[in-house]
A protein has these predicted regions:
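Charged, solvent-exposed interaction patches on well-folded alpha/beta domains
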Residues: 1-229
Length: 229
């Protein structure tokens, strides 16, 4: 993040102070000098208190570091350890405070791995469900999938005007194909190939005046099967 002109001026002002007090040998001045530019407070915004406390604890080692020589890249590496963070910005407020603004990743579904519940983040990471309050409005996702496969599938659905909030359950199969169950209990079976076209067909059927059945089966090439169960 680039420093504004005003902030650069402030930095130069404090540097001049640092140069001045560095030349003073008085004992009290030495104590003052040693403490003036140490990080005394780290302010975190953008997350709830539970996560804020966790992050603050991990950033504790940056306190009492000289703010001029504290490299933001080192702070960035520490923030990257938290897989629920999507974006962040770091700002030094001289003489002794850090401001860190965080943006959480968007949660797009829930799944289970090794019998433990995880949220799926739009940042392509699995996030322990213990990090957040229960999210009941997310689709449950079953199967051994890679997150990038899920993200690509969601992108295709959104490109074809599917409302992801209407999806209740998602199933991924070893054959690399998807089934979805909507909140109205409509099951849509997609093929493993030509997925984009199949999604278009499914959306057209849903948007048509035809009375919807229970199943739209698109697994067989050039066939559309609509049935009651």
């Amino acid at each position: 993040m680039h420093l504004s002109k005003n902030n650069k001026n402030i930095k130069y002002f404090y540097l001049l102070i640092l140069i001045f007090i560095s030349s003073v040998n008085n004992y009290n001045f030495q104590i003052f000098k040693n403490n003036l530019f140490k990080v005394s407070k780290i302010n975190i915004s953008g997350v709830e208190n539970k996560l804020k406390n966790e992050i603050n604890l991990n950033l504790e080692s940056f306190k009492n570091k000289n703010i001029f020589f504290l490299d933001k890249k080192i702070i960035s590496e520490e923030l990257k350890k938290f897989n629920y963070i999507e974006h962040y910005s770091i700002f030094k407020k001289y003489p002794s405070e850090l401001y860190i603004d965080l943006k959480l990743t968007k949660l797009i579904g829930t799944t289970f791995k090794n019998n433990k519940k995880f949220y799926v983040g739009s940042n392509k990471k699995f996030i322990s469900s213990t990090k957040f309050k229960e999210k009941s409005n997310l689709p449950n996702i079953f199967g051994d999938f890679e997150i990038i496969e899920l993200i690509n599938f969601f992108d295709l659905l959104e490109e074809n005007n599917f409302n992801l909030k209407d999806i209740k359950q998602i199933y991924f199969f070893e054959s690399k194909r998807w089934d979805i169950i909507l909140k109205n209990d409509l099951l849509i079976k997609f093929p493993s190939s030509n997925l984009d076209n199949s999604i278009k067909i499914a959306k057209n059927i849903i948007d048509s005046d035809l009375e919807l059945k229970k199943v739209i089966d698109l697994r067989v090439s050039n066939q559309v099967i609509i049935r009651d169960e």
